[in-house]
Regions:
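Short, small-residue-biased leader/transition segments that mark boundaries at the very start
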Residues: 2-9
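Structural detector for short beta-strands of small beta-barrel domains
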Residues: 13-27, 58-60, 81-94, 122-128, ...
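Short aromatic-glycine-enriched beta-strand elements
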Residues: 28-32, 95-98, 169-174, 211
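Beta-strand/loop nucleic-acid-binding surfaces
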Residues: 38-54, 105-117, 148-149, 180-193
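A low-complexity, Ser/Thr/Gly/Pro-enriched, surface-exposed linker/loop concept
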Residues: 53-71
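Intrinsically disordered, low-complexity linker/loop segments enriched in Gly/Pro
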Residues: 78-151, 165
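Long, low-complexity, charged/polar intrinsically disordered regions in eukaryotic proteins
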Residues: 172-223
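Strongly charged, low-complexity linkers/loops
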Residues: 213-239
Length: 239
């Protein structure tokens, strides 16, 4: 079966993302939602809104439970398919690591998708996607391969959302808007940054090679700040 469709309708659902689905049946242990071609999908009692009734449309996240059955939840996971996040390792076994992403079933990272052997209690930046063969939701710490190679259409001064990804000799690499790679230069960072931090930033420039230089202060504001200091010094000297 193919969960990779970008279209979400009554007959096409998206695994690892939120879907608007209709309540079609009430049972003792929850309600069933119309999953189109996939049949009815259970939303367990603990996630059913109090005033829920047949015919209502609910915004639910879909994933596979411990028995590989399609199941719905109204909880918001820490990452969805197609997104990047910094998550903590809950446990490991002979097959790989399992990350806490806010749902009952932990998110699997196979050994082949780990840059270094993941350790319990440590956090790692990952990308969540559907495995091509099993259609399970899995994660990869090899985030470079999931970043867009297209040239970003940003202009200088554009505000973006970033996830601090990696410390380098030049500064910090960041993932921009869940899609592109950018760089914050060490000499332009005036606060303490750590891998996994999420924040707003501004585009300083998109270089000829398509790489994005970032800055935490809106371009131009540093000049205003310099002018303010100069003016203050002038007033003090001439008071």
């Amino acid at each position: 079966r193919d969960w990779s469709s970008d279209v979400c309708s009554s007959d096409l659902i998206e695994l690892g993302k939120f879907n608007q689905l209709e309540v079609v049946k009430e049972v003792d242990f929850g309600v069933y939602l119309d999953g189109g071609e996939e049949g009815e999908i259970l939303l367990p009692t603990r996630y059913v809104p109090e005033d829920c009734k047949i015919g209502d449309f609910l915004n639910v996240f879909l994933y596979l439970d411990m028995d590989e059955r399609l199941i719905a939840t109204t909880l918001t996971p820490l990452v969805q398919v197609g997104q990047f996040a910094c998550l903590e390792v809950a446990w490991v076994n002979q097959f790989g690591a399992f990350l806490n992403w806010g749902l009952m079933k932990d998110l699997f990272v196979p050994f082949s998708e780990q840059k270094m052997k993941m350790q319990v209690g440590r956090k790692y930046v990952i990308h969540a996607h559907l495995d091509d063969e099993s259609y399970r939701i899995v994660a990869s710490a090899k985030v470079e391969r999931y970043l867009s190679k297209d040239r970003p259409e940003y202009a200088s001064g554009d505000e973006v959302n970033i996830l601090i990804w990696q410390k380098t000799d030049l500064g910090f690499k960041a993932i921009i808007d869940n899609k592109y790679s950018g760089l914050l230069y060490e000499n332009e960072i005036f606060s303490t940054l750590q891998t996994g931090m999420e924040m707003k930033a501004f585009v300083k420039q998109v270089r000829e090679d398509g790489k994005v230089d970032l800055i935490l202060q809106k371009p131009g504001f540093e000049k205003i700040d310099d002018f303010s200091k100069t003016l203050l010094n002038y007033i003090r000297e001439n008071d």
